[in-house]
Amino acid sequence: MFLVIGAILAGALFVGLLLYQLKFKRLIDLISYMPGPPVLPLVGHGHHFIGKPPHEMVKKIFEFMETYSKDQVLKVWLGPELNVLMGNPKDVEVVLGTLRFNDKAGEYKALEPWLKEGLLVSRGRKWHKRRKIITPAFHFKILDQFVDVFEKGSRDLLRNMEQDRLKHGDSGFSLYDWINLCTMDTICETAMGVSINAQSNADSEYVQAVKTISMVLHKRMFNILYRFDLTYMLTPLARAEKKALNVLHQFTEKIIVQRREELIREGSSQESSKDDADVGAKRKMAFLDILLQSTVDERPLSNLDIREEVDTFMFEGHDTTSSALMFFFYNIATHPEAQKKCFEEIRSVVGNDKSTPVSYELLNQLHYVDLCVKETLRMYPSVPLLGRKVLEDCEINGKLIPAGTNIGISPLYLGRREELFSEPNSFKPERFDVVTTAEKLNPYAYIPFSAGPRNCIGQKFAMLEIKAIVANVLRHYEVDFVGDSSEPPVLIAELILRTKDPLMFKVRERVY
């Protein structure tokens, strides 16, 4: 009996391995034309990344592209997993500009325990319908109301910066921690309509849970040892993730239930206008309110549906904005002439009274600040790598790409290509001035918010928040970099772009 069972299992294993080998051989044959570094059996190119510090991975990918790629296309094997890296805007346009490659790469699965099937990771019909109902949440009338939240959050940030200025003086301090708490405050209030007061209560259970999940995601997505569920679930990291997820999901669920009950009592669900242009015009609304009043196929969204999107909004609008702001302050601190122009523009638009609140109209007049933000995102895109999954054999500009391939596109790499941007390692905000510049920019060379149908739905929200915080900080302080400005920061291209070492700043009060 046991011999029969053993023989059946052995036979099944043999057949499985045979089928896998045939499939793998087919993949190798189909992709044999594509250049790539020398490969090792079983691990592929994994030995270049396993056990290496994160900042070394960025250098290695750039080195591979410069050394081995042909027409800016390169294959990289991570074990049996085929990855194709693309750095030609013509290829990028095909991948991002159509719905043929609408599915995210396998690395995004690490996000599913928190975001479930939210807009970032959903696909097909569900993605299309969710995108349609969420788009009105970023109408200018609603963004106008969100500026009040940005104003409040940035004022709290100023108080914390003043404390650190008095405490540390010329020795400097890291802006990132305060900026990160500021963006957490603003994203919570705009997403759910509640204040978590992260800047005054950084040790709260919710704030710590967000930090834990951010740490887990970075490790899972870019550490091969954590990528396999069977081994990952046995680690302390998995237990920390489970605990943090319980906190986050329970918090969001509680807010959803409370707000749904309030809307029922108010009768808002029946009275609100269905016209996109009127959404949010009558009353200040959070992202959550819009979801609670939305329907898909004439049915209201469930609490789980709403939680997926609120959590996605929280994730996408928190660390990304913090990263952009940190690199913005680094750029203007190391380019005093740009900082001076930003300050003069802010002062001329907002006025001499530092207590004057910023507004939607005023922020849209900050033209030079806008150029500096765009140039910062070219040099230091918050999301350094985008991924798509190929579901069936296809051709991209004559290049055969097999089903199952992960396509990797790096906004960081594209933004540093000399063929696409003159002096790519120099901070030149004027390159984005469509009025004065002679430099023609390829729309698929500059993709800090991705591009095409799956581009970042909240990019206008992000730009407004960044400019609101910048306007208030620069009205009050002159920002100086504490460090060697002749050496660029060492980058870590994880889920969100970071630096190997904290960027340190000192601030001086502006008197005028």
UniProtKB/Swiss-Prot annotation:
Gene Ontology molecular function terms on file: heme binding; iron ion binding; monooxygenase activity; oxidoreductase activity, acting on paired donors, with incorporation or reduction of molecular oxygen
Species, as recorded: Drosophila simulans
Gene Ontology cellular-component annotations: endoplasmic reticulum membrane
This entry's Enzyme Commission designation comes to 1.14.-.-
Keywords attached to this Swiss-Prot or TrEMBL record, sorted alphabetically, are: Endoplasmic reticulum, Heme, Iron, Membrane, Metal-binding, Microsome, Monooxygenase, Oxidoreductase
Protein name in the entry = Cytochrome P450 4d1
How does it sit in the bilayer? Answer: Peripheral membrane protein
For activity, the cofactor(s) needed are: heme
A Pfam family reported for this protein in Swiss-Prot or TrEMBL? p450
**Chief localisation class:** endoplasmic reticulum
Name the gene for this chain. Cyp4d1
Report the Gene3D superfamilies cross-referenced here. Cytochrome P450
Places the protein is found:
Endoplasmic reticulum membrane; Microsome membrane
